[in-house]
Amino acid sequence: SRILSICNKNKIPVVPFGTGTSLEGNVVGNEKGITISLEKMNKILSVNAEDFDCRVQACVTKEQLNEHLREDGVFFPIDPGANAAIGGMASTSASGTMAVKYGTMKTVITGLTVVLPNGDIINTGGRTKKTSAGYNLTNLFIGSEGTLGVITEVQLRLSPIPESIMSAVCHFPTLEDAVKTAQETIQYGIPIARIEMLNKDQMDISINYSKLKDVNVEPTLFFEFHGSEISNKESIKVVEELSNNNKGSKFKWAADLEERNKLWQARWDVYYSVKALVNNGRVYSTDVCVPISRITECVKFAEVEVNKIGLRAPMVGHLGDGNFHVLFPYDPNDKEIYKKIREFSNKLIDKTLELKGTITGEHGVGLHKKSYLLKEHPDNIPLMKTIKRSIDPNNIMNPGKIFDLN
């Protein structure tokens, strides 16, 4: 509070920093100023297992929290690929592989403590499942990427650990067959917890990087079912039938906890497996999300356009909620390659907006997607700027992110 008050009076830019796992330059300091590290704000303040909620400081990580919760029979279900800090996940409105069942950070956050640019401290929301008490200030700060204040505490809704968890892998002859199966699974109303897609190229990379065994280099879906043993078996029967109708292979089951963890670790390691393809390289990741009825069309479009430019670009997707990523490993010194990547990205964004989708499902806007936000919400940005100027008139909070104020 004192730091922000001093910075505000002296018009010194401030960038809040947690674990630094964001992908869009969200925590890059692009002006002279200071970075506030929240790494020591890593305490779990309270757990109320009987009410399925907890309160944590901003730099508690998802893994730290779930380790702490294990004996209480509850868990925190939002699981991005990186071991991100909860405050950062709130700031980008993150999600992960289980969003299809448990939602995103917007779903599970019921309250925040935020330090405003002038040093004032506010508490939004509370512990209840619902409230009609005034403006929803909690949701104002979720996804604001540190541009309106510093999130220091987060009130979270938790979920009970399921009685039965079953994971399986299914291979398909084409990517379209895999995506169609995922789309139909959701449209049939199957209560699935995870339905993740890896294309053929990404399976090849993941098998080598994560040492996966007994899986094929083919377009693949990773499934996970949460519920009672009886309900899971009923869901599995329907999904197996849908997969079979789309030329899917026989399900390969990850029977025990160790096998399941290895399978999902390979999915979480996708970004790092692609990064390892280029020495000192980077990974450009798209993050489009479309209505579930348009996911097959959008993935097919991306596949065709990738083949046109002739670059290696593995694909992964949280297909259950219409979100997928095309990953380009590249050398930052190769301007020609980067130009091709951006041209592809521009085409995919245009197609996504044509399909009534969004430019970013979970990574946020940061520095890299500002021009795309102008395409998606040209009418909304003036109001966003009005809100920003009202809360942060000196523009000290993470300036230059999401949009350019001036």
Show where each model-derived region lies.
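Glycine-rich N-terminal segment of FAD-binding domains in flavoprotein oxidoreductases
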Residues: 1-41, 56, 76, 318, ...
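Conserved, mostly hydrophobic/aromatic
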Residues: 7, 146, 326, 392
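Short, ordered loop/turn segments at secondary-structure junctions
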Residues: 18-21, 41, 81, 197-200, ...
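FAD-binding subdomain of flavoenzyme oxidoreductases
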Residues: 43-196
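Activity-critical C-terminal alpha-helical subdomain
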Residues: 120, 369-406
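C-terminal substrate-recognition/cap domain of FAD-linked oxidoreductases
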Residues: 160, 169-171, 179-344, 351, ...
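Alpha-helix capping/hinge segments and adjacent helical runs
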Residues: 353-365, 378, 393-397
